[in-house]
Amino acid sequence: MPQLDTSTWFTVILSMIISLFMLLQLKISSHSFYLDPKTMSLKTTKHNLPWENKWTKTYLPLSLHLH
């Protein structure tokens, strides 16, 4: 059974890592980022809900009888 020739593995792996790094750098450099981001002021809105203005009755279950 012949032995596996691993003499070129270092060159192949190193060139692959370098090319992936270059490709990643090109992908990242193509994106445009905002230079001066401004904070947005968030305004809270008050919702008028009908159950906030009046009390609601709470009923006991039918199985509980108070005498």
From Swiss-Prot:
Keyword S-adenosyl-L-methionine in record: no
InterPro entries xref list: ATP8_mammal (IPR039017), ATP8_metazoa (IPR001421)
One of the record's GO molecular function terms: proton transmembrane transporter activity
GO cellular component: mitochondrial membrane; proton-transporting ATP synthase complex
PTM sites of type N6-acetyllysine: K54, K57
Primary location: mitochondrion
Annotated localization: Mitochondrion membrane
Keywords: Acetylation, ATP synthesis, CF(0), Hydrogen ion transport, Ion transport, Membrane, Mitochondrion, Transmembrane, Transmembrane helix, Transport
GO biological process, one term: proton motive force-driven ATP synthesis
UniProt modified residues of type N6-succinyllysine: K54
Record field: transmembrane: 8-24
Entry membrane topology: Single-pass membrane protein
Chain's role: Subunit 8, of the mitochondrial membrane ATP synthase complex (F(1)F(0) ATP synthase or Complex V) that produces ATP from ADP in the presence of a proton gradient across the membrane which is generated by electron transport complexes of the respiratory chain. ATP synthase complex consist of a soluble F(1) head domain - the catalytic core - and a membrane F(1) domain - the membrane proton channel. These two domains are linked by a central stalk rotating inside the F(1) region and a stationary peripheral stalk.
Quaternary structure, from the entry: Component of the ATP synthase complex composed at least of ATP5F1A/subunit alpha, ATP5F1B/subunit beta, ATP5MC1/subunit c (homooctomer), MT-ATP6/subunit a, MT-ATP8/subunit 8, ATP5ME/subunit e, ATP5MF/subunit f, ATP5MG/subunit g, ATP5MK/subunit k, ATP5MJ/subunit j, ATP5F1C/subunit gamma, ATP5F1D/subunit delta, ATP5F1E/subunit epsilon, ATP5PF/subunit F6, ATP5PB/subunit b, ATP5PD/subunit d, ATP5PO/subunit OSCP.
Family of the protein in this entry: Belongs to the ATPase protein 8 family.
Protein name: ATP synthase F(0) complex subunit 8
Organism: Cavia porcellus (Guinea pig)
